[in-house]
Amino acid sequence: MSELSDAEKRRILKERRQKKFGSGGGTNRLNKITGQADSLMSTESTLDQRERTPEAAINTRQNEAGNNQSTTDNNPQVSLLKQLAEQDRQEGSEAPPDLMSMLQSMTGGDAKNGTPPTLGTPPAPVDQSMLDYHNYLVNRLKAWSIIIKWIVLLPYMYVVTHDVPLSLPFGLMDSSNFFSVLMGFEIVATSIYYKRLQSIEKGTSVNTMMHGSMIAKLISLIPDQAPQQKNLKSRLFTLLQYWDVVSMLITDICFVLVVLGIFTHI
């Protein structure tokens, strides 16, 4: 058998030492060298602690996390912040307000307290049954006003166009005064119509223009923070009211002209 070389001897010696230290021999040898075999102080080798180090580190981190959690729970400021965050999440989960409520809050109205809508502000939500009843009353008023107008105008136009001998005061039978009489009658009829319409709106608490006109709803969207904007909205609503009256007058005049043309050929 050939002799071992120096490199092989060193390798074998190194393996033996590692095996000896791995079985706890490192601690015994350290105690013998330092003379602390019977000492109360720990002389355990770092090689022997290598296996237990990860477990000890994990336990240390768990203890620190538990201490931090208990400190957080005992802190009143942290508890208050948690409560506020929970309230924000609950409020965020609620249904968003409808469009009319948002517009009411933008223009200073109060739909919850039942503040009646004013001209230039978005109308508060109205019960659909009440709105249907209001529309029924308004449509009936329009129908009756048209019927009464033509019950008066049709005979008068026939008498004027056919020279029927009637003695009426103030020159009512004179054809030259026809349009003056017509305009006076329209003014009286329109005044009665709007007077009756106001009484209906007062009884149902529904604004006919704000709920029935798309143009009025668009005008109410204009913000009124500045005086110029308020003045603009007021003028637009005034023009819209005048246009309602003028449109009724134009409609009646058109029908009068058609009927006059028919009567002149009869």
UniProtKB/Swiss-Prot annotation:
It is a multi-pass membrane protein. GO terms for biological process: protein insertion into ER membrane; retrograde vesicle-mediated transport, Golgi to endoplasmic reticulum. It is found in: Endoplasmic reticulum membrane; Golgi apparatus membrane. Signal peptide: none annotated. Residues 1-54, 86-123 are annotated as: Disordered. Residues 1-140, 198-244 are cytoplasmic. Its main location: endoplasmic reticulum. Belongs to the GET2 family. This is Golgi to ER traffic protein 2. It comes from Zygosaccharomyces rouxii (strain ATCC 2623 / CBS 732 / NBRC 1130 / NCYC 568 / NRRL Y-229).
